[in-house]
Design a protein with these regions (language model features):
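Mid-domain alpha/beta scaffold segments of enzyme catalytic cores
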Residues: 1-257
Length: 257
């Protein structure tokens, strides 16, 4: 019953990056039972492209934001895009102290600006944090945690999960939850209340086992969900239903859209 190939289940991929092959990828996702996808902006150009794609697909929504890698380019033009009907969140925004592609001062400033935007607009905030847990929590505590906040591609353990959940945030689990070495992450999933969990692919990155190392796509989100269900000790169908409902509620989507 818990086979991830069950096509009677519907899933919601709440974080992906759709590229030039988006039409084919979206079509395959629908066949695989994916009822919706949030296509995430990482800079001004990418956010504009995400909006354009979402306008032509009723089951695709966009976010607008500046990824920490792109923080050196600033925030120009971002706020103006938030009013589009297809835009459901600010982000992905945050801190990446692993790569440091942008100076940390600029990362911090751009993250703070996006937390403030989410609060001003009463919009969800999508967070990217890597090797910067304490700094990320500190920024949120200073600016105020938006009422709807998600830690995308959550990679922490039980302690980090508690710190996120304690701030009212949701955790979004990616294909990493299927990786052999990810015991700490599975422990975090087991500790996460079902109403605070979402699933994502982060396509085209982080393909779940057995596709690891190849291009990822939203059609594979069921593999992520099955691994989360196993970690939680819950039925896959229950996790599919709950994470989809959580995503629609989090992003403010109508149930019939």
């Amino acid at each position: 019953q818990n086979s991830p190939e069950r096509v009677d289940l519907t899933w919601f991929d709440n974080h992906c990056h759709l590229g030039d092959d988006a039409e084919d990828v979206i079509a395959r996702a629908r066949v695989a039972g994916v009822s919706g996808m949030v296509n995430v902006g990482t800079d001004l150009e990418g956010s504009r492209a995400a909006i354009a794609l979402a306008r032509s697909h009723p089951d695709v929504w966009a976010t607008v934001g500046v990824h920490p890698h792109e923080a050196r380019h600033g925030m120009d033009g971002i706020a103006e895009l938030l009013g589009d009907d297809t835009v459901v969140a600010v982000g992905e925004a945050g801190l990446d102290h692993h790569y440091d592609f942008s100076p940390r001062r600029q990362q911090a400033d751009v993250f703070a600006a996006q937390i403030a935007l989410a609060n001003e607009r009463s919009m969800p905030l999508v967070i990217h944090t890597r090797e910067a847990w304490e700094e990320t929590f500190a920024a949120l505590d200073v600016e105020g945690v938006p009422a709807r906040t998600v830690f995308h591609c959550f990679t922490g353990g039980v302690d980090e999960a508690g710190a996120c959940l304690g701030r009212g945030a949701l955790l979004s689990f990616s294909g990493i939850v299927t990786f052999g070495a990810a015991d700490d992450l599975r422990a975090a999933a087991a500790a996460c209340p079902l109403d605070r969990a979402m699933v994502e692919t982060d396509s085209p990155y982080l393909a779940p086992v057995p596709h690891r190392g190849r291009a990822n796509e939203p059609a594979y989100v069921a593999l992520v969900g099955a691994a989360v269900a196993a970690a939680m000790g819950r039925d896959v169908a229950e996790v599919a239903t709950a994470t989809s409902a959580n995503a629609r509620r989090f992003y403010g989507l109508d149930q019939d859209s």
